[in-house]
Amino acid sequence: MRIGLYPGTFDPLTLGHLDIIQRAMALVDRLVIGVAINRDKGPLFSLEERVRMVESECRAIAANGGEIVVHPFENLLIDCARDVGASVILRGLRAVADFEYEFQMVGMNRALDAGIETVFLMADARRQAIASKLVKEIARLGGDVSSFVTPDVGAALMAKYR
């Protein structure tokens, strides 16, 4: 069984994330979505809220075949990959700036475990501008986030900023 790990903070989960998840499902038998506990980022949503958000929004994708498991983690990404039995880490790229950061991460991860590959999926052109940080800013200022997140995620965002 080919297991892939798609890690992220998912604060909030965006349509860009969902696009990568859907496309990643075609590459692996089981996709583990690693919801990172990143205290440096100071997430808007709690870990529990983010896990529920990912589980809820991925039900329809999983119903089309394949297995999705949501797994919170706080350790090194490469250790998380080992813990869940992943042979590949899947990452989405929106722009050159993403690549520069990810390139460094691949080098470090490869030094820690050369047996785990990293595969990059380019963001769909319609989703390249979507960034969780910007979506939160739009929501905070009362803007319409419906082009960037699902209705349920949008409602959760608006509730946070009321």
From Swiss-Prot:
- Which GO biological process categories is it annotated with? coenzyme A biosynthetic process
Q: Which UniProt keywords apply?
A: ATP-binding, Coenzyme A biosynthesis, Cytoplasm, Magnesium, Nucleotide-binding, Nucleotidyltransferase, Transferase
Query: A single Gene Ontology molecular function, please?
Result: pantetheine-phosphate adenylyltransferase activity
Residue sites binding ATP per the record = T9, F10, H17, G92, L93, R94, E102, R127, Q128, A129, I130, A131, S132, K133
The record's annotation in Pfam families points to: CTP_transf_like
Name a single GO cellular component: cytoplasm
Residues at the site labelled Transition state stabilizer: H17
Q: Which reaction does it catalyse?
A: (R)-4'-phosphopantetheine + ATP + H(+) = 3'-dephospho-CoA + diphosphate
Superkingdom, natural source: Bacteria
Q: What class of enzyme is it?
A: transferase
Q: Does this entry carry the keyword Cytoplasm?
A: yes
- State the needed cofactors, names only: Mg(2+)
Q: Does the keyword Nucleotide-binding apply?
A: yes
Q: Where does substrate bind?
A: T9, K41, L77, R91
Q: Which pathway does the protein contribute to?
A: Cofactor biosynthesis; coenzyme A biosynthesis; CoA from (R)-pantothenate: step 4/5
**Stored NCBIfam families:** coaD_prev_kdtB (TIGR01510), cyt_tran_rel (TIGR00125)
- PANTHER family with a match to the protein in the record: PHOSPHOPANTETHEINE ADENYLYLTRANSFERASE (PTHR21342:SF1)
Protein function: Reversibly transfers an adenylyl group from ATP to 4'-phosphopantetheine, yielding dephospho-CoA (dPCoA) and pyrophosphate.
What protein family is recorded?
Belongs to the bacterial CoaD family.
Q: What is this protein called?
A: Phosphopantetheine adenylyltransferase
State the species of origin.
Answer: Cereibacter sphaeroides (strain ATCC 17025 / ATH 2.4.3)
Record gene name:
coaD
